[in-house]
Amino acid sequence: MVEAGEIGGAAVFALAAAAALSAASSLGAVDFRRPLAAVGGGGAFEWDGVVPWLIGVLGGGDEAAAGGVSVGVAAWYEVWVRVRGGVIAPTLQVAVWVCMVMSVMLVVEATFNSAVSLGVKAIGWRPEWRFKWEPLAGADEEKGRGEYPMVMVQIPMYNELEVYKLSIGAACELKWPKDKLIVQVLDDSTDPFIKNLVELECESWASKGVNIKYVTRSSRKGFKAGALKKGMECDYTKQCEYIAIFDADFQPEPNFLLRTVPFLMHNPNVALVQARWAFVNDTTSLLTRVQKMFFDYHFKVEQEAGSATFAFFSFNGTAGVWRTTAINEAGGWKDRTTVEDMDLAVRASLNGWKFIYVGDIRVKSELPSTYGAYCRQQFRWACGGANLFRKIAMDVLVAKDISLLKKFYMLYSFFLVRRVVAPMVACVLYNIIVPLSVMIPELFIPIWGVAYIPMALLIITTIRNPRNLHIMPFWILFESVMTVLRMRAALTGLMELSGFNKWTVTKKIGSSVEDTQVPLLPKTRKRLRDRINLPEIGFSVFLIFCASYNLIFHGKTSYYFNLYLQGLAFLLLGFNFTGNFACCQ
């Protein structure tokens, strides 16, 4: 059965595609009969004189200085021109048009998501309107104990010295009848000192009457998925109708369960209620500011659009409440990828379950405070998403409990465009092909692909992030750098290369408290090689070289300015400069 939201989503998607193509056509942008512009400009006439002249000058001799070159050098240059024009340029030209197609896919997808998101906001189509929601017994849980279901709160953690007290304390202070709430701490810590502290904290809350369970494992098999699976195997879990999950740095408000659980109670076809993330350290550096912009777009646009149209989106791994039955029917937690949360969400959706995203409910958390930590987090997510696409695509195709429109949305929009196309085209086109084009005059890149489409994506992003407008230039450069890592991660996941299933825990520093609540372990000084990111520095050298080449030999064009900025961004992040100062207040 096709839902009304799915039909509306399909209609909006068709309108977005039509609008994008119509705008491109009216601007004269889409004209495949001839290339509209060549980035780097220039023709063969300029190059045929400049390069041999330089070779001759560098080789020395009066004849070289006068512009002549030896027969040997001329022969080598002729070989280069032929190879460049006959092999390199045609190969890159194919890549250009593939990237153009991918770029159109991106802008249509972004237009669709933003249109839905803006529409939901404009008409006030709140989750409480789309789904039944009635408040429970409110402030006095004791009076309404009979209608309160049994809920378990799971907190997986691994050596979370700086934040373990915050998450455990917030979970234990949730407004819910004491006899209807179980707090389960899943501690995979390998440090005995930290493990002891976490256990003591659990005992402290237990002495206050909280039903808190401390669960450990003999090994970290399956990492977070393995810990959650272990928690679900406990006998007392069988009596719990709903499972709330929070990572160790998340601090839910006391009324979190009162606002989320009623959605599950009154809508038997709903499996998941996802809340939005809020951040306690989003103003500490330029790095955290651009991260916040990234997550704001994800929640405001992508999650909202998926929830409003197809009642499907990816579980964010934390700050959500699951129906226990849905988890079990989907096969429970699996550790086959590094995105166990997305894996469970897709499998549950294939069984016909619906999801609700509630953007008004926000849960405080911590952003990665270092560039290295953020890169490891993004690599895990990008690699895991692409790898899951490889493993579950066929299951989506043959699923019988979802509509054809929903299958299309999951395979095309959710997986193909976001997990594969987006990281590929952004890196290949803007960080490789465009810089190389300044040295290959035979290569033509349509101006609509490197000007109109990026501008359209920028406007679409800004519309839903107006408060972050002053951060936009930094965000553009930062995302340019991150595309290299995300493309490598996507390829690793798709091809299951070495390290595709490697799990790395994101380091937290407990930024939400002014004074550290526990004594920190002694800090070790990082070695120089640990503070330098060679891939980023390598790309910066490449981009700056291309920019300089463009400036010297094609000074009439202004593309070198963009390349210099990209190269500078790569260079700064290559040396781990993330703007740790009060900027853009």
Curated annotation (Swiss-Prot):
Main location class: Golgi
A single Gene Ontology CC term: Golgi apparatus
Enzyme Commission numbers on file: 2.4.1.32
GO biological process, one term: cell wall organization
Transmembrane segments: 87-107, 420-440, 443-463, 534-554, 563-583
Subcellular compartments: Golgi apparatus membrane
Bilayer topology annotation: Multi-pass membrane protein
Residues given in the record as substrate binding sites: 247, 249
Gene Ontology MF: a single term: glucomannan 4-beta-mannosyltransferase activity
Catalytic activity: GDP-mannose + (glucomannan)n = GDP + (glucomannan)n+1
InterPro entries cross-referenced by the UniProt entry: Glyco_trans_2-like, Nucleotide-diphossugar_trans
Record: active site: 188, 341
This protein's record includes keyword Transferase: yes
Keyword Membrane assigned: yes
Keywords for the protein's UniProt record, in alphabetical order: Cell wall biogenesis/degradation, Glycosyltransferase, Golgi apparatus, Membrane, Transferase, Transmembrane, Transmembrane helix
Pfam families the UniProt entry points to: Glyco_trans_2_3 (PF13632)
Family to which the UniProt record says this protein belongs: Belongs to the glycosyltransferase 2 family. Plant cellulose synthase-like A subfamily.
Biological role: Probable mannan synthase which consists of a 4-beta-mannosyltransferase activity on mannan using GDP-mannose. The beta-1,4-mannan product is the backbone for galactomannan synthesis by galactomannan galactosyltransferase. Galactomannan is a noncellulosic polysaccharides of plant cell wall.
Protein name (Swiss-Prot/TrEMBL): Probable glucomannan 4-beta-mannosyltransferase 7
